[in-house]
Amino acid sequence: MNQNIAKAILPLAALSCAQGKMLAQDVARPNILYIMCDDHAMQAISAYGSPISKLAPTPNIDRLAQRGMLFRNCFVENSLSTPSRACLMTGLYSHQNGQRQLAEGIDTTKTFVPELMQKAGYETGIVGKWHMMCKPKGFDYYHILDGQGKYYNPNFCTTGNYGKYKQEMGYATSLTTKHAIEFLDNRQKDKPFCLYVHHKAPHRNWFAEPKHIGIYDGVDFPLPKTFWDNYENRGSAAKTQKMNIEKDMELILDFKIPELLDTSDVESMSSYSGLMGELGRMTPAQRMAWDKYYMPRNRRFIEAKLSGKELAVWKYQNYIRDYMSVIASVDESVGQLLDYLKAHDLDKNTVVIYTSDQGFYMGEHGWFDKRFMYEESFHTPLIISYPGHIKEGVENTDMVQNIDFAPTFLAFAGVEQPKEMTGKPLQPLLAGEKPKNWRKDLYYHYYDYPTYHLVRKHDGVRTDRYKLIYFYGKGGMRAVEENKYQNIAGTSENNCLRYLYATNYFNEDPDVSYYELYDLQNDPDELNNIYGKKGTEKVTKQLMKRLNDYRKELKIDEY
């Protein structure tokens, strides 16, 4: 066994056995239950203590934090759904595994972590959102949603029938939980398991389960202090994005107001079609629950004729109310899975990991969505519990990243980490230790432009105090020539591009090539770009060197 991995595992599991003996004793190889939500912000988990979550608590996720370790500084390497999932599966950065963007790209010749877990004797399964354009590799069992999936009565395909989707009646979060429990019920009891539970929730457009619709009606969530940000002191990327709650959230689709349909407007028609795509799947009982809340709310909104800041605040409040109503089902799911483990005497030998594919804006800077290297979307929640091996109720502030997840899985399984994986197993941190060579900085790279939200391509490096970001690339439709799959007819990337162009989505964005520098100690909200300011020469030089070192070491190929 690789000595570094052995040192990480043995103190944690209190073992003194060689690799062969460890592989023969399943007690040394815990079960792994990995729960990942889509777009679940740290701000929406009460264990992290944000003002939003105090009004909409998550008691079951908090319960997990109380019995394990909560990470305050977990980050992603590319804040976008599919690239994040590809990183999880391969342990590689986006440019290494091919998945730079949302649709095409994943290099299926790369070894997937579940394949290595299988070889180590684990029974592997995944339920819920897969969202990669390839067949699940390395899984004994899968029961996955069709692409992004729908909240109501979604389509799933299962093991042996990849691509053959069938509709199932119910709510996506509840159905995903049901299939997770089915896997646990039917697994081979003489083998350890590794189960990925990937929820669609709380992805946009935030359709709550019938029993949770409107549960936060009347709750006034506090506005983030940066909600009215005007993006001064920053470059053009913060100004040309399309993820502003006030300007870019759609009244028909995001706020579920079909009464506002304008049949003469292509954007209105598109938004209405998206809403009907969800409402049209509902059963009469589901639609009745939806109508009971939204119809009177919509009437009140239309009669109020809000505009300006009043409209922006209304949008914010109802965005957060719907989002947190969706989270209520996620929290219940976590509770059900924890209860199952305890009831079946699996809780003591199961590592439970809770995270999200990336962070999300909950009104900070006036935004929703993710993509930027700014803190709210760069951060992601991470909570890990392993009773008897990880101290209860502890917090960790070391810098970790989602490229560390794959090595951590392998270390728990006693599998040597492939050399191509550059992440670090988290076992030393989980054991309360911090290796002297633990990272002092992180690399980030976002590629997906031009597409939804128009966030510009950028990469950067972050230390515990400073962050340097480089924005680059051609603007608007000129950027398509730099985008591999958008140039290939028939690809999902090309189809998306054509749709957005037809609906007049794109701006005439400028070509960009500029840096931003932030002092996170004195400016945690990243409102003041100090790049080029007097007194920053030394730290800028240090960060520039580190950024260029990363580009060279990782063989970044977009320059």
Describe the residue ranges of each PLM region.
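Residues forming the ATP-binding cleft of Hanks-type serine/threonine protein kinase domains
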Residues: 521
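Formylglycine-dependent sulfatase
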Residues: 2, 13, 17-497, 503-516, ...
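Positively charged n-region of N-terminal signal peptides that target proteins for export
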Residues: 1-7
